[in-house]
């Protein structure tokens, strides 16, 4: 645990008692603060009381008298589409609002570091797609190289549940836009921006607000090194804003398709090969086609981002290459479930938006595509250019009929349920084809989260194997 510093003897309200909320309460208490907890769920409140915490109704009048700070969980809206009433009450009372990420950055460094030979470092990864894989890949590479490392944030543990830093340790954090938007302190040593595509726009008031939330990680006084994906306009803009000149090697540009040879430092993938260029010279080349845990161009972009981040931390190209080869991938992200009769079954349940689904569809030449769920703003019409590899679509969930109207002449069948979609796709698939779950939609119409959707797909597939 990382005790929260600077709030000794102060009352701190905590809103939202999920994983991060309870971890925050423990860290506040360990640092000498008095946490006052609240959640709309009676079950969550009872669980907190069972752990010995004080539960206080933050919805009542004058609830914030004498309170120094409100710490809120990332899933609770603080501005758009409308502020949570408790957050609105805190802001009206002049009480600052923060989250566990902000508390982490104000508390991570300690006096113990004076005795360290090598200062601990923090690497933060943000973006629309590939954050989790990139974060896990950086952590894996560091571990394989023998560097002490911990991983947390939007993946794995809550940040305040981490152990205090060791000599030379690297903490790798995945940060969503919800987390970067509200954190009052963001001071990573290395920051990674993978890409940007429309997502969570209701929470940010539009695309501009969404990009602004991500960009906060790179604010003045932020990272020593920035790794920026430049395959979208926002990444190009951000890299330009952070660079003093094209040869500035504090910014490492990455791409999954473009040649980037003219910049101070770049890492890019083309035709299955990763190349590192620095000041006009090629420094390394890696064959990504031999990496079983990193299929497709989208994973090649993740590999470029992780490679660049690890190079800034002093790892050698061959160390990184060896670790890339041993990376098994993450569940629900281009995850091979099995193969039968020459037909491969792949679970990419995390492909919840158009951009991530497009990248999944580009990874295989012949696809039986299972898609649908709770559609997002804008639908899936933008996927039209990527449907050439789709032999047939099997549509499920709330948006099945809407999706059918948006995929044009692509052969399709409305299946409604995962069970029927898997059965029909498996029945019709031919050797050499891939049955791919890449929903291009949220899961909440039929499942509590994308993980449960992916698990259901895998269960149905394994029953057929």
From Swiss-Prot:
Its EC number is 6.3.2.9. It is an enzyme of class 6 (ligase). The keyword Nuclease does not apply. Keywords: ATP-binding, Cell cycle, Cell division, Cell shape, Cell wall biogenesis/degradation, Cytoplasm, Ligase, Nucleotide-binding, Peptidoglycan synthesis. InterPro entries: Mur-like_cat_sf (IPR036565), Mur_ligase_C (IPR004101), Mur_ligase_C_dom_sf (IPR036615), Mur_ligase_cen (IPR013221), MurD (IPR005762). It comes from Cereibacter sphaeroides (strain ATCC 17029 / ATH 2.4.9) (Rhodobacter sphaeroides). Its main location: cytoplasm. One of its GO terms (molecular function) is ATP binding. The keyword Transmembrane does not apply. It is found in: Cytoplasm. This is UDP-N-acetylmuramoylalanine--D-glutamate ligase. It comes from the Bacteria. GO terms for biological process: cell division; cell wall organization; peptidoglycan biosynthetic process; regulation of cell shape. Pathway: Cell wall biogenesis; peptidoglycan biosynthesis. Cell wall formation. Catalyzes the addition of glutamate to the nucleotide precursor UDP-N-acetylmuramoyl-L-alanine (UMA). It holds the Pfam family Mur_ligase_M. Belongs to the MurCDEF family. GO terms for cellular component: cytoplasm. ATP binds at residues 127-133. It catalyses: UDP-N-acetyl-alpha-D-muramoyl-L-alanine + D-glutamate + ATP = UDP-N-acetyl-alpha-D-muramoyl-L-alanyl-D-glutamate + ADP + phosphate + H(+).
